[in-house]
């Protein structure tokens, strides 16, 4: 799962984790316009919501950096911000989530489009998981790349960040790469046939 936020007292850590490519053996990543655009859009969403909540950004790395996870690498920007005295965690979560990675931008239009065209219930996919006391502490994650285990099937849920610069075949390959990490966990134990 991707960190949505980690709250300790009046300090919150969050991140932009957007922009994906295949993991490289040499760690020599070159990020394209599409991945940088995707990362920037998600970052602006986070920063706008910090500002709306009257939060004070204490720390933000100057440029996104690369992190590796499973078969892929992502662009990441970290934020630490101080909450105001009248900060409402529940209200902030509702403005921060769904993130552009989950619902697109503008969020309301993106969610309407997903509801009209996606064709299935996401259940826990893209939901929020974690722990909080809704006052001083919270450690919450966006449930991306998850699986649902049924009696005779396993459904793996992954997605891709689609922008106007996206190439459909590249997005499809990204989802295959993301699913391979989860497949490697279960495939040695369970015979699997893959349906696309």
Feature annotation, model-predicted:
Residues 1-41, 136-159:
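An anion-binding catalytic pocket shared by soluble metabolic enzymes
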Residues 2-3, 78-196:
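Conserved hydrophobic core element of enzyme catalytic domains
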